[in-house]
Amino acid sequence: LSPAAAIAVSNVFAPTERDKQTRIGVSEIGDDCERCIADKLLGIPHYTENTGTPLAPFLGTAFHAFAESRTKNEPNVLVEQRVEVCDLEDYGRISGSVDRFDIAAATALDWKLLSRKKISVFRKSIKWDNALPRFANTAAGSQFRKYYIQIMLYGYGLTQLGHEVAHCSIVALPRDCSVEVVPDSICEFSFPWRQDVALAAIERLKNIWKRARSHDGRVDSIKSSPLCWYCSHEHHTEAFKNYNMNG
């Protein structure tokens, strides 16, 4: 890059406070992989071969900022509403931001910028059984279930603020679009809000946290998910196996 372009890129893609976040967030609680959740809770970093700013999440962050600026003054709508979902003993409060909550419709929305292929695979990875979603036992199904748990937790956080929640939606937009138009290219996955799903996710998180801190400070007994890309590529470092609660 030229010096001028290098400076521009450096400034635009500088890490945000969210990028620097080391504590676990609501979006990570539904991860199938208990070992990765334990990593996050204990502050064990994940290393990747890539350096620099990942472009896909950056585009998602940029869209969220744009959506917030366009809609934050709408009546009867909460945009980027902070919610708290639980308080882990000796860890602290875990909170997140709901992209959009329509108070009149009692519906929480979560924007997702995904590839067209991922949206298509998501459609195929879910089936309904007596109005309940069943996710395929695949990598895509695992990721979709993670998103589903995330929005159930957002709904729970909203109820803790006194709001009534009836539905939660994942609104997926194709980030690799070309001639697609809105709204035809948008895919909404709408679910009835279920408190039991949120409470089960919170209880699981507490259980992982308890186990991560037990075993005389060792955490290597916590198992990986067979669907976890990070673990399947053996990206866990020796730091995990040798991690000790006392450092």
Description of each model-found segment:
Residues 93-96, 146-149, 153, 200:
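Residues forming well-ordered secondary-structure scaffolds
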Residues 1-108, 115-129:
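Metal-dependent nuclease catalytic cores that hydrolyze phosphodiester bonds in DNA/RNA
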Residues 1, 138-145, 156-247:
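Metal-dependent nuclease catalytic regions and adjoining charged, substrate-binding loops involved
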Residues 128-148:
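A short acidic, glycine-rich active-site loop
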Residues 62, 66, 149-157:
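Short amphipathic alpha-helical face segments that pack within enzyme cores
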Residues 112-115, 174:
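A short beta-strand motif that forms part of the nucleic acid-binding face
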